[in-house]
């Protein structure tokens, strides 16, 4: 029998959640997702040593070490990672808008347009890129504008049905509901252990998937943030799943039978809902898990963005010495 990874590929688009060039070349995912954490990790590998040198040299020509130049070099490096990944996968690469813009709709739109233009300068068209935005109200509204301009978006840090409903109304190309981080919250909050079937993260994604398919919503559901292969197997059949190299390797080594768990042909009828800003914010306020994990996720990505910029500043300083 073929591996569980190959069986999964037959029913779900497999995406690699990594900037590891060697892993992507070896595991052959359709798409890749990145975030500030992944970009930072990738830039510490030999594969991107030349990209770092090039970006620093470019930064020196822009006039040194101002905050604006440092931010521009950091952007250039994130695009370098994305461009390298785009050369290895046939599909899309997700690149994230700065986490510190998560509550600024217009700034997020401006940054997204800049990312798309930066990729185009490297010969990579917008059809190959997904703009990642946090699923705040402001991020979702930014996605609505960008989608109307033909810029496809990946709404990330999604932890609730309310976020999923708002993303659908914005006609987002894709959402990334987080599985493992939801599990983390419930384990810490309740002290309980969960099976793959009772895993609150799995239950959340299944609920969102059912709502979308029952209402003919075209937004792609891509489960993310997995803690174990059990969660992945429990979502087999989901539109897409973005998976770390370690878990992809584990699936590749397992030749057991993989059972399909999700199918658009097997959903329960569910009423279509609509949320204005007040209703969205109230729903989030009532969901402690979603509120806490969204805020935490933004803080963590913002922290890694600061770390990336600090690295850039040090490199620029060293180059000037």
From Swiss-Prot:
Subunit note: Homodimer.
Protein name: Transaldolase
Molecular-function GO terms, alphabetical: transaldolase activity
Domain of life: Bacteria
Pathway(s) per entry: Carbohydrate degradation; pentose phosphate pathway; D-glyceraldehyde 3-phosphate and beta-D-fructose 6-phosphate from D-ribose 5-phosphate and D-xylulose 5-phosphate (non-oxidative stage): step 2/3
Keywords: Cytoplasm, Pentose shunt, Schiff base, Transferase
GO cellular component, one term: cytosol
Source species: Agrobacterium fabrum (strain C58 / ATCC 33970) (Agrobacterium tumefaciens (strain C58))
Localization terms from the record: Cytoplasm
Active site: 132 (schiff-base intermediate with substrate)
Function: Transaldolase is important for the balance of metabolites in the pentose-phosphate pathway.
